[in-house]
């Protein structure tokens, strides 16, 4: 598979995973109040947030030593993804209800979704860590 096709497949998988996870988040945040269309929109928003943060990481982190890639990947992306999923929780939550433990746990699950889908990136499929260009 060419790198361009691999990147496109990865982007689509990332979007699908984010949309599915946003559907779960909507069920937690707005029981009975939102469906698949909203999940697709929130999935697109989450994907775009990840792309923007990914470009920023690429610019700010710059070149890294290959021997430190795994450490750098987790040190950089763990807090970035906490911010990204917190933004999503703020966007999807029903503001008439208090913030719930379930929504906080949904954010934690979102971090896991983000990291697991990175395994399907072109770099991840080659056993490497992507830092700054993996669509967060």
Indicate where each model-derived feature is located.
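Juxtamembrane/disordered regions of integral membrane proteins
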Residues: 1-136
